[in-house]
């Protein structure tokens, strides 16, 4: 799909997905290395990224570019990835 044929709604959602994917990559890097998620620097970066994405989503919803349920689905996916990281780290510590 070319830029000309994409609607503003499609562009907005694609940009939000790309930003969410960057956060997921950050989470996956942590999972791959099983670095402690309680690391203050990691927590601050992740919190900042999640907050920024939530504000982007809110803005897109308020403009009518995406549905609130689509934004919630993006954030829910990130929460699941984060839960998986915490579970993996917890399992590693138990061993």
UniProtKB/Swiss-Prot annotation:
One matching Pfam family = DUF1507
Q: Which family is it part of?
A: Belongs to the UPF0358 family.
| Record-given protein name | UPF0358 protein GTNG_0942
- Species annotation: Geobacillus thermodenitrificans (strain NG80-2)
């Amino acid at each position: 799909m070319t830029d000309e044929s994409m609607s503003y709604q499609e562009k907005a959602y694609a940009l939000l997905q790309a930003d969410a994917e960057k956060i997921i990559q950050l989470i996956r890097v942590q999972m791959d290395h099983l670095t402690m998620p309680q690391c203050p620097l990691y927590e601050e970066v992740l919190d900042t990224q999640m907050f920024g994405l939530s504000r982007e989503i809110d803005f897109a919803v308020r403009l009518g570019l995406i549905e609130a349920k689509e934004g919630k689905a993006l954030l829910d996916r990130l929460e699941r990835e984060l839960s998986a990281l915490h579970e993996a780290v917890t399992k590693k510590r138990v061993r």
